[in-house]
Amino acid sequence: GLLDSFKNAMIGIAKSAGKTALNKIACKIDKTC
């Protein structure tokens, strides 16, 4: 239902935000950016 779609959207946003954060951290650590 609507709640499930909302939950899935939130999970998707959280995952992509987490990936971005991890990329920034990795970038600072190994200076590949």
Curated annotation (Swiss-Prot):
It holds the Pfam family Antimicrobial_2. It is found in: Secreted. Has antibacterial activity against the Gram-positive bacterium S.aureus ATCC 25923 (MIC>72 uM) and the Gram-negative bacterium E.coli ATCC 25726 (MIC=18 uM). This is Brevinin-2PTc. Keywords: Amphibian defense peptide, Antibiotic, Antimicrobial, Disulfide bond, Secreted. The keyword Secreted applies. Disulfide bonds join C27-C33. InterPro entries: Antimicrobial_frog_2. GO terms for cellular component: extracellular region. Belongs to the frog skin active peptide (FSAP) family. Brevinin subfamily. GO terms for biological process: defense response to bacterium.
